[in-house]
A protein has these predicted regions:
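GST-like domain detector, emphasizing the conserved glutathione-binding G-site
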Residues: 1-138
Length: 138
């Protein structure tokens, strides 16, 4: 399981994604997703949660109203981006990071996630390549 995208070289960097980091300001029980309904990355995580049959609570963050900069959200995700997944008070950020965590934690109970080890490695290779692209250079 990949828990750190290729661009995160120092876990202390603000830009580094979080993986199950305890947070006193986050909801301490249950599974919570902070997301923007029209965000493609948020849609990917919602789809993953549904495909895996995970029960979760929705916390819409309205980007047009700048809710991602509210003090309560910044305490949870200092990058001020969506989506953010919280499981029992532990924060995970970055779409691919979240999906990797969900598959590892909740198993592959759905055919969408069933693959051979070779197929999984190939998919992970291309996901890492895409995550490492410097979009502004394109």
């Amino acid at each position: 399981m990949r828990l750190k995208p290729v661009y995160a070289t120092d876990p202390n960097l603000v830009d580094a994604p979080l993986t199950e980091v305890p947070n006193q300001w986050a909801p301490q029980q249950g599974i919570h997703l902070y997301h923007f309904p029209l965000s493609l990355d948020s849609q990917k995580v919602r789809q993953g949660l549904e495909e895996l049959g995970v029960q979760w609570q929705s916390h819409p963050i309205l980007l047009s109203a700048h809710q991602q900069f509210s003090p309560s959200y910044v305490r949870i995700n200092s990058r001020c981006v969506v989506p953010t997944l919280i499981i029992d008070g532990k924060v995970t950020t970055d779409t691919i990071n979240i999906l990797d965590l969900l598959v590892a934690r909740f198993g592959t109970t759905n055919k969408c996630f069933e693959t051979s080890e070779e197929e999984t490695e190939l998919v992970n290779y291309w996901i890492d390549k895409a995550a490492g692209l410097f979009i502004e250079a394109l």
